[in-house]
Amino acid sequence: MNIDYSEKIPNNVNLSNDRRLQRALERWQPEYLNWWNDLGPDKGKELEVYLRTAISVEKEGWAHFDFVRMPEYRWGIFLAPAEENRKIGFGQHLGEDAWQEVPGEYRGELRRLIVTQGDTEPASVEQQRLLGHTCPSLYDLRNLFQVNVEEGRHLWAMVYLLHAYFGRDGREEAEEMLERHSGDPDKPRILQAFNEKTPDWLSFFMFTYFTDRDGKFQLASLAESGFDPLSRTCRFMLTEEAHHMFVGETGVGRVVQRTCDLMKEHDTDDVRPFGGIDLKTLQKYLNFHFSVSCDLFGQELSTNAANYYNMGIKGRYNESKIQDDHQLYDSAYSVMECKDDKISMAEVPELNSVNERLRDDYIDDSELG
């Protein structure tokens, strides 16, 4: 399933067969490029960067590497291959055919999920736009730019869904994604974690370790969706997301290793005089980024999350591998609660604790690294 790069907007969704949609996206494209030039990587316009570009959505040979100036990067619309006779795997529609169009009764909920996910993609680019001025190495600079262009492509993925399936409302939502800005007092990003500053490279490494890992779990749960175009979009986004977490894992690992080496060499935990980052600072950064990333999963008990699950539009992480009835009408889940100034575990309806289960899975994955 190769990608057509001869078109103005590279894609594998036969965009040329839908002239109305093609024209709408081509009108949005210059607005996106203006946003990139204004709020993308600062002073990165003329740099030739060795970037990965998707040329296929198949597992083998899906990417091409070459030098490219970032404003000339070919952002496009790529969906994973369709699964023949795919069925909805959870909720009240369990076993029914996956939807190729938006069910009218779930239109508002699906749009809200897509907008919330889509809003995070340009937000992180805005947060990281000045990091190129202080990069530890060219290797790190290249990784930063790779993450940035792929976050931009993930925005394109969500904007395609809004334009293709939500009509005028979707087009307006796509425009508003470029009007909101990270940390803007008047028009901030939807989720608070994406309004925080990323002023230095330790923040960036922690962000790609923890916050991009949240992205992995959110995308994986959306990839279970009964709305097939959303599922296919998120499945391919997960392929690109893996590199973002690699940047975080190896970045944090290098910092910690350097700290340990200096502690051993100088027999002290005060490594700042020797150019290291001390353990107290590492712990402070870890606490902050882990906390704001955990907040992204929402409340422990959530009616919205229960409704999304019951509707079949957002599942659990690795839904098909979970051994239960995939409807959760009578099952329970343990969550922490604060009662009488004490924290204890309580059994609650599992359908209402879908957020907490996803957060628990995220925490387990974060501990593994």
Regions found by a protein language model. Name each.
Residues 67, 107-117, 136-154, 229-242:
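Alpha-helical scaffold segments that form or flank carboxylate-/histidine-based iron centers
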Residues 130-142, 165-166, 217-237, 251-280, ...:
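Inter-helical turn/loop segments and adjacent helix faces that build the functional surface
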Residues 1-135, 139, 165-202, 286-369:
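Terminal targeting/low-complexity segments that flank the catalytic cores of oxidoreductases
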Residues 117-125, 147-162, 179-187, 208-215, ...:
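Alpha-helical transition-metal enzyme core signature, strongest for iron centers
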Residues 275-287, 291:
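C-terminal edge and immediately downstream basic/flexible tail or linker adjoining helix-turn-helix-like DNA-binding
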Residues 155, 252, 260-261, 323-325:
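Short, surface-exposed, polar/charged, turn-prone segments marking secondary-structure boundaries
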Residues 212-215, 234, 286, 359:
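Active-site-proximal structural scaffolding
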